[in-house]
Structures are given as structure tokens and as C-alpha cells.
Amino acid sequence: MLQVLQLIMNQIQDSRLMMLKVLGSSSKGNCYIIQNESEALILEAGIKFQDVKKALNWNIAKVKGCLVTHRHGDHSKYIKDLSGCFYTLALQDVFDYRGVTGNKLVPITPGSRYKCGNFKIIPFDAHHDVPCVGYLIDHPDMGTLMFLTDFYECDYRFSDLQHILIECNYSDKYLVEAINEGRTFARQRDRLLKSHLSLPGCLEFLNTSDLSKVKEIVLIHLSSENSNADEFVKAVEDDARKPTYVAYPGAEIDITRTYD
């Protein structure tokens, strides 16, 4: 009898296990899946739909929605394919730019509340070089997660977060090195300053945030030329005193809710 009860308890715990799966996190394409056994939420539409379906083990029926932050191709290129199957939340600017129509498109307003299955979602403005949002995402099995990519400044800070996905794109040290070696155009520096978050900017954002309940920090959208993953992780861990990871394609991170 005790063995049966333990088996049932284990099955319940497994069904509540919430995982973050990284499909892509760079200028080549961005996509993440938040999922447990019964529900999934897709973040970004920058990866081929076939690869998304494969990452879901072909169980697309459990997908409750897809969130897109902005119009750039590495985040929205495949929005037509995904929005043909799933409710897709994005700024109207994204739908207009991509020329997509359909009854599963949900134009969002920053600050408004949305729900996809048991996922509760609030978009908020982020400063990029095109209209852009971040998302607060809450689920009973996960707690609250902040997803903030492709920005150089954000006017908001949030409390009661358990999980943070935040851009940490470059540092001046590696950017200058890449420019001097001819791997990066000098003009790119001016664009980066007004479009993407540097390592110091990431540290400043975290230092001015309430991290008291944060379980982990995931660094996303690192530049292939202007960053150093190991160095960035160490800098954030030393400063924020939280376990820190880099969103490599194929990575899976446990983001199950914890209780103090």
C-alpha cells in the first residue's frame, strides 16, 4: 500500500515538474519552451516550426500559446507557421510587419493581462530599436518568471520573481577586441548601445531588482563575437549571488516552483 501511495505521489510530482527548454538564443534564431507534462508555452518564433514540434516530442496539443517580443527575424520569422496552430500574443506592429492574419492572433497592450491555459501573462514595455516588450509569466507549477530580451533599458523592476531570463549580449571589452580584429564593424558599437543589454547593464538591472525569491538567472541572447559565457556567468553569480546559466541550444533547466 505504501509503495502504491509513493508511486502516486511521484507521478503527481512529475506532472508538476516545469522545465525550460532552449531551442535557440542568438541572432541566428530565438525560441524557448516552458512546459510540464500537460501544458506548454512557446517564447519567440525565431526557429523553424518543424524544430519546435520536434522539441515538443510532437505533442503540439499541449501548447497553450506563443509569445513574441518584437518584429526582428530572429524572434518572429516563423510567426505565420506558429500562429496557424497556436494563439500567438504579440504587438500589432509584429503582425503588421510580418503580414500575418488569422483568428489565433492576439494583439497585446503592455500592462494588460492575458491567459493561455494556466499561464498568466503580463507584457511590459522594453526599450529596443523597434517596438518591443518583455513578459511576466506566472503558472501554479512555476511561480513567476520574467522574460526580457533585446533591450538596452527597461523602466520597470519586479518583485516576487522566482525565475529570470535576461539578455546579456556583450561587454565593451570583447566588443572592442572584435572591432580591432576586424570581426565586428565599428559602427555596430553605436547600434548595440541603443538596442542590446551589456554585461554592466545586466548587472545594474539585477542590482536594482528584488532577487530575494529568485531561484536562478538565465542569461540569454549572448553575442557570438562580443561576449564570453563563462566570464559573464561568473560576474552575475558573484554579483547577484544566484545560480546562473547560459541559454545554450538544447539546454533544459528546471524551473519548477519552490516554496520557502
Where does each model-flagged region fall?
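Active-site metal-binding motif and surrounding structural segment of the metallo-beta-lactamase
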Residues: K48-D93
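Metallo-beta-lactamase
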Residues: L89-M142
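Divalent metal-coordination and catalytic microenvironments
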Residues: I34, H70, I121, D150, ...
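Conserved beta-strand hairpin/beta-sheet module of binuclear metal-dependent hydrolase folds
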Residues: L2-L56, V133-D150, Q162-H163, D172
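Active-site environment of divalent metal-dependent phosphoester hydrolases
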Residues: R71-K77, F95-D96, D129-P131, E153-Y156, ...
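Short, polar loop motifs at secondary-structure junctions
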Residues: I47-K48, R71-D74, L91-Y97, P110, ...
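Cap/insert and terminal regions of metallo-dependent hydrolase folds
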Residues: F158-G250
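Structured catalytic core of nucleotide-sugar glycosyltransferases
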Residues: K28, R71-D74, I121-P123
